[in-house]
């Protein structure tokens, strides 16, 4: 199967798995008489379970993604989504919604396979284009879903439960699509062959001391983790890779947190609970995200030169908008700010994915993508535990957004610092080059003078 065909199937998978019209209305649905869960229970007892389960599930997921070569992990994501929406449709009470969030956390962790799968089948020269395609496909799925959801709610054609039933049907369909994804050619055979050669050599030396199947398995395991260690050591010396990975982790942490709790803020600002425009907001947000994900592919930006400056400016903008959200009494301001924040993130995470993939020297994209996401979710878990969880500060929703604003201000400060170092380094290098040039000219002039005399 050609890489174009595989990319098309992967894009179809991404579009259908994101076709979940109920997503923008999750908080109104859970707080409605249908589920009868209070807002305080939602953001202190239910939603934190997604963050914690996501963090714990990421560890095996980003290791197994490369070992199992992507497809099985994609299947786990699909099954996790089915379990999530089955619980949303049929479940009752706080504890079942907690299980629902755990299931969604596992599915979210497995999503790493979807975004790294493409790099195992596409030549390096196509990374930027392929990244744009798969991210745009996922965003287009959201676009259609959110538009449909808002239309059905605004026209009173259906209620929140029907939206969740439609979402359940979509995630069941995506499980079938996942079956048709081709398996990526495994590197395990090559490693196992090398391990088998080692075992055969050991057998010649001491037949009684070797058990071939076990030795082969242990040799493969050692070989794989040795490869991981070597890959991480190489990555730790790549400044460009570290820069983008740092932004990926820090920005994803903040944006995930905002996405998790923004509906709680909107709920507080909405005067009429029956007149909810969450779907419109997510529709516009997703349309912009899809456009920017494709548009950035056509921009000729020197990310090595201008990356720190762009990351600094955009993080500062996000910090200002989040503070505005925390102080506003108008839901339209909160809606608009959210759209700008997530659009910035969609655009830059596409650039980050392509730049990180470009810097990698092997097929361990699942490992590196997983490491970045794992750091993000660890930070988010800490943030959730301290700021949101009922066992710690348990801050009100507006104060939470003040904290998130301060968090992005810190991110902006970090990249401002890197930007200043970069400017100083360039200035210093330019001065050194100029001094060297002048010294060389003086030597040449002296040489000419001596030759003439």
Curated annotation (Swiss-Prot):
Identify a single GO molecular function assigned to this protein: vitamin transmembrane transporter activity
Q: Which GO terms describe its biological process?
A: transmembrane transport
In Pfam terms, one family for this protein is: Folate_carrier
Expression (tissue specificity): Highly expressed in pharynx and posterior part of the intestine. Expressed at lower levels in the body wall muscles, head muscles, and vulva muscles. Highly expressed in the intestine of the early larva, levels decrease in the later stages of development.
Glycosylated residues, chain numbering: 36, 260
Q: Which domain of life is it from?
A: Eukaryota
Q: Does the keyword Transmembrane apply?
A: yes
Gene Ontology cellular component annotations, sorted alphabetically = plasma membrane
Compartments, record wording: Membrane
Q: How does it sit in the membrane?
A: Multi-pass membrane protein
What UniProt keywords are attached to this protein's entry? Answer: Folate-binding, Glycoprotein, Membrane, Transmembrane, Transmembrane helix, Transport
Note whether ATP-binding occurs among the keywords: no
Primary location class: membrane
Q: Which residues form a coiled coil?
A: none
Provide the phenotype resulting from gene inactivation: Worms display defects in folate uptake, reproduction and movement.
Listed transmembrane segments: 48-68, 73-93, 102-122, 136-156, 161-181, 276-296, 306-326, 331-351, 368-388, 401-421
| Homology family | Belongs to the reduced folate carrier (RFC) transporter (TC 2.A.48) family.
Main function: Folate transporter.
Q: What is this protein called?
A: Folate transporter 1
Q: What is the organism of origin for this protein? A: Caenorhabditis elegans
């Amino acid at each position: 199967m050609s890489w174009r065909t595989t990319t098309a199937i992967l894009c179809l998978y991404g579009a259908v798995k994101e076709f979940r019209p109920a997503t923008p209305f999750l908080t109104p649905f859970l707080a409605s008489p249908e589920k009868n869960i209070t807002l305080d229970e939602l953001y202190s007892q239910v939603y934190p379970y997604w963050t914690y389960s996501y963090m714990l599930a990421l560890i095996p997921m980003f290791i197994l993604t490369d070992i199992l070569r992507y497809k099985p992990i994609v299947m786990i994501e699909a099954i996790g989504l089915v379990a999530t929406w089955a619980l949303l449709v049929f479940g009752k009470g706080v504890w079942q919604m907690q299980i629902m969030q755990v299931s969604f956390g596992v599915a979210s962790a497995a999503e790493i396979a979807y975004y790294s799968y493409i790099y195992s089948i596409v030549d390096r020269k196509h990374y930027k284009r392929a990244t744009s395609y798969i991210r745009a496909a996922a965003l287009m799925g959201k676009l259609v879903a959110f538009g449909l959801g808002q239309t059905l709610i605004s026209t009173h054609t259906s209620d929140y439960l029907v939206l969740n039933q439609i979402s359940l049907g979509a995630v069941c369909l995506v499980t079938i699509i996942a079956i048709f994804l081709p398996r990526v050619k495994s590197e395990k055979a090559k490693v196992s062959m090398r391990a088998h050669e080692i075992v055969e050599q050991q057998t010649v030396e001491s037949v009684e001391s070797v058990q071939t199947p076990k030795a082969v398995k242990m040799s493969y395991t050692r070989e794989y983790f040795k490869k991981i260690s070597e890959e991480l050591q190489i990555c730790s010396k790549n400044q460009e890779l570290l820069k983008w990975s740092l932004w990926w982790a820090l920005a994803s942490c903040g944006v995930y947190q905002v996405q998790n709790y923004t509906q709680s803020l909107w709920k507080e600002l909405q005067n009429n609970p029956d007149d909810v425009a969450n779907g419109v907001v997510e529709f516009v947000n997703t349309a912009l995200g899809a456009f920017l994900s494709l548009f950035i592919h056509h921009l000729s930006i020197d990310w090595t030169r201008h990356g720190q400056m762009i990351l600094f400016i955009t993080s500062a903008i996000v910090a200002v908008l989040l503070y505005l959200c925390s102080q506003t009494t108008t839901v339209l301001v909160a809606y608009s700010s959210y759209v700008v924040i997530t659009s910035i993130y969609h655009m830059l995470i596409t650039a980050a994915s392509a730049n990180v993939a470009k810097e990698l020297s092997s097929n361990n994209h699942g490992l590196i993508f997983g490491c970045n996401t794992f750091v993000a979710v660890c930070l988010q878990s800490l943030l959730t535990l301290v700021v949101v969880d009922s066992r710690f500060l348990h801050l009100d929703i507006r104060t939470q957004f003040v904290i998130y604003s301060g968090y992005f201000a810190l991110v902006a400060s970090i990249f401002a610092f890197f930007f200043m170092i970069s400017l100083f380094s360039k200035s210093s290098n330019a001065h050194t080059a100029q001094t060297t040039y002048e010294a060389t000219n003086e030597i040449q002039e002296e040489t000419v003078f001596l030759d003439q005399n």
